[in-house]
Amino acid sequence: MFSYNKERSLRIWELAALLALSISLCAGAWAEARQSSISSRLIRLHVIAASDETQEQEIKLRVRDAVLEYLAPRLDGATDAEAARELIAANTDGIAKAAESAAEGRTVRVTLGRERYPTRRYDGFALPAGEYESLRVILGEGEG
């Protein structure tokens, strides 16, 4: 009788471990599908400061605001991420000029491509970690 209970107990543990593994795999697949769904519908703006110094971080925020102000009317008619991507690609020179106007003499490089991001929390929502289409505006050496 002791052997029967021991075997049954071991079997229950095996089933519990299998169930936990299955739940983990499903949760991971769901999270990946969710991130993929979100990332296919948006383009992230990543302004990289020249350094971590306070003044450089303030300039970065002014550049961000200038780029968003430049892009807002141009992206107003975009119906999806692909249309937005095309509009951004067609306006990289204008984006660079808008950034330069706020960059206080720092060099500016503008690129559009894919980039990995950590989870980022904003007021009222969060974007999961993953790979996103990204408009990058790099100031100076981009070490900030």
Where are these regions (language model features)?
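Early exported N-terminus immediately downstream of N-terminal targeting peptides
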Residues: 41-92
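N-terminal Lys/Arg-rich, disordered targeting/topogenic segments
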Residues: 1-9
